[in-house]
Amino acid sequence: MKSCPKCGQQAQDDVQICTQCGHKFDSRQALYRKSTDEDIQTNNIKMRKMVPWAIGFFILILIIILFFLLRNFNSPEAQTKILVNAIENNDKQKVATLLSTKDNKVDSEEAKVYINYIKDEVGLKQFVSDLKNTVHKLNKSKTSVASYIQTRSGQNILRVSKNGTRYIFFDNMSFTAPTKQPIVKPKEKTKYEFKSGGKKKMVIAEANKVTPIGNFILGTYRIPAMKSTENGDFAGYLKFDFRQSNSETVDVTEDFEEANITVTLKGDTKLNDSSKKVTINDREMAFSSSKTYGPYPQNKDITISASGKAKGKTFTTQTKTIKASDLKYNTEITLNFDSEDIEDYVEKKEKEENSLKNKLIEFFAGYSLANNAAFNQSDFDFVSSYIKKGSSFYDDVKKRVSKGSLMMISSPQIIDAEKHGDKITATVRLINENGKQVDKEYELEQGSQDRLQLIKTSEK
């Protein structure tokens, strides 16, 4: 179609004269227009044929670019570079992410310790060289799947292993730091609280029992911690150094603000050693001059006293208070008994005991003769006055006499004797009818006019 330049009427391309105004069209313009339209149509056909090829070429370029991008971030060499850069730049968070596994979460503080350990025990330059060589060998090998980087002393510090592929083309390398177990062995039941793997952790260790506190990657650690015992709460650190371990465990050194108490007693020579006690903060314990008591927190006062027995009576020292400001890691204290008071009491009791022993010697000398006479004559009346009527011992001896099973005794010796009210306990050494020496414990009752009678007996 074309338009009349004079009146604007639309007409077919092959019409020579406008049907409305009679204007005569130029035949050369129509021919030119027809030629131009044909050229455009031809060019359009050519363009449509080229588009698929252009799209295909563009996609190919994109694939090539994508491959190189993936290679830059996912090839074994790229994975190695990421770890190396993180260690070189002390990027503890990145190192923690790279080393963490499902079974062992590594936090940023552990990673920081690990980075320093690598730089100190391997050397950064050597570590980078060893790591690149190891990755290269694993990547080329058809059989090897894992290898270790080691410290100068031969400790395994990093495990490098193949772990499948990435995006079909690239071997996936895994970097894992070996772990060991730090162990504690407290003198008494202890609760430890600290942070591990980014989380708060609590470990309860029984007295004198080896207890692991977790799994840690190699490093030299000084972990802030709290510990609690029956003696109180302590703030400080758990310290352990993997350079000092050739096994799967490493000993923990405790560094807490604590005081240990050494006690010296004076004026205690007359006290029974087994009866001596020390009371610290209301907790009573057996005394030993070679023992160290504690530990106790250094931020709280400590009260301490001692006690002991002599001739059945308990004696105590004055209670002393050690101020927190005076507490040291090793603190010595002396506690004094009133030696004159103890000696006076012991002297008095010894006089009483000597008097009692003399009475008992006389009693058992008569009893042994009466016992033997009752045996020889089969007559309980010989011995009945020495035994309290109605007691189980009275009935037992009477039965033995009637059956002829009463034992002969001789040479009684008083080994020990104590009196409590009207009751007396005595340890007596005898020789039986077989000629054997035996120790027997007797209980007696002191009646009117200081008359003694046996109540019961047993062999010691």
Curated annotation (Swiss-Prot):
Extracellular compartment spans: 71-460
GO CC terms in record: membrane raft; plasma membrane
Keyword entries, A-Z: Antibiotic resistance, Cell membrane, Membrane, Metal-binding, Transmembrane, Transmembrane helix, Zinc, Zinc-finger
InterPro entries to which the protein is assigned, alphabetical: Mem_prot_TcaA (IPR023599), TcaA_2nd (IPR054529), TcaA_4th (IPR054530)
One Gene Ontology MF term: zinc ion binding
Annotated TM spans: 50-70
Membrane topology: Single-pass membrane protein
Entry's localization field: Cell membrane; Membrane raft
Record flagged with keyword Metal-binding: yes
Function: Plays a major role in decreasing resistance to glycopeptide antibiotics.
Protein name: Membrane-associated protein TcaA
Organism from which the protein derives: Staphylococcus aureus (strain N315)
Source organism phylogeny: Bacteria, Bacillati, Bacillota, Bacilli, Bacillales
Gene: tcaA
